[in-house]
Structures are given as structure tokens and as C-alpha cells.
């Protein structure tokens, strides 16, 4: 299992494309308070998110949805989206992307962590610039104007 700090969050790759004949990827994401990725869209993958703990606000297109434990949401490809931990403690998500491939972007954009107990690293300006620069190779656009 690969564990990566990406966008200030900790992502554990539970199943990667090599495990699923490239059909899907399953990841566990730990978001500190205020954590979550910048607004972006995928040209290749659809995503689902199941909130395992905490409170997360999802922005999918023009729709804003606040979810707590057990909440589930779909983020289709080609639709801008992002999410924020809007609770007071850590939030945990189970994320599925299909087809597989987004995990290779996370590995390229993030930094390896030793295990699932490690805390995510700070998301620096250099990390943001790198993420924006490499995202197109993976069919992803990082949207620089954040509404929320």
C-alpha cells in the first residue's frame, strides 16, 4: 500500500489500477480541519466519496453539499469539483475513481509517507506550482480561481 501526502492531505492507496485491471482505484483520505484539494476537474475519471468521519463540504459544479459520516456523493468527470473539511476535527473519506489512474497523479504530485499513521505534510506554494504543472499529463486541470 502506498501512502502519500498530497495537497496537505494523507492519501492511502488501498487498491490501484494494477490491482483492478485498470478499472478503478480505491483510496482512503485523511483531511485535517480546512483540508482538501484545490478546485479541479478530471477529463478521464469519475469519482465517488463516502464520508467515514467528520464533516466535509463538497463543491460539485454549482452544487454545494455538506456531508457527515455515511454521506455519499458522485463527482463526474468534466465537472469542476473540490471539497473541504469544514468540521473541527479530522475527516476521513473513502474515495473511488474509475477508471484507475488518478493514483499515479497523486504519486507524482505528492510526497511518500511511511504509513497510514503519518500526518500529512504542509501544502506549500512549490507543491501547488508542481501540481498545476504536471496535472495535464494525467488528464486533470487544477482551477486557479477558487470560488469557496
For the regions a protein language model found, what residue spans apply to each?
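Short histidine-centered beta-strand/loop micro-motifs
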Residues: 15-16, 38-43, 84-86
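A contiguous, mid-protein "functional segment" used to position or interact
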Residues: 89-133
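Structural motif
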Residues: 10, 48, 55-57, 64, ...
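Ligand-binding loop in jelly-roll beta-barrel domains
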Residues: 20, 57, 77-103
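Short acidic-glycine-tyrosine-enriched beta hairpin
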Residues: 62-80
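A short, N-terminal "cap"/entry segment at the start of jelly-roll beta-barrel domains
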Residues: 1-24, 118-148
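Short acidic (Asp/Glu) patches
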Residues: 10-11, 34, 76-79
Amino acid at each position: 500500500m502506498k501512502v502519500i501526502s498530497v495537497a496537505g492531505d494523507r492519501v492511502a492507496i488501498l487498491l490501484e489500477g494494477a490491482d483492478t485491471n485498470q478499472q478503478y482505484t480505491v483510496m482512503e483520505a485523511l483531511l485535517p480541519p480546512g483540508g482538501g484539494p484545490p478546485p479541479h476537474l478530471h477529463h478521464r475519471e469519475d469519482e465517488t466519496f463516502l464520508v467515514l468521519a467528520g464533516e466535509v463540504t463538497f463543491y460539485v459544479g454549482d452544487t454545494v453539499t455538506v456531508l457527515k459520516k455515511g454521506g455519499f456523493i458522485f463527482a463526474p468527470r468534466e465537472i469542476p469539483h473540490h471539497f473541504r473539511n469544514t468540521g473541527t476535527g479530522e475527516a476521513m473519506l473513502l474515495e473511488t475513481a474509475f477508471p484507475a489512474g488518478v493514483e499515479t497523479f497523486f504519486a507524482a504530485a505528492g510526497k511518500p509517507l511511511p504509513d497510514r499513521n503519518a500526518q500529512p505534510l504542509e501544502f506549500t506554494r512549490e507543491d501547488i506550482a508542481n501540481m498545476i504543472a504536471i496535472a495535464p499529463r494525467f488528464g486533470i486541470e487544477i482551477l486557479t480561481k477558487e470560488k469557496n
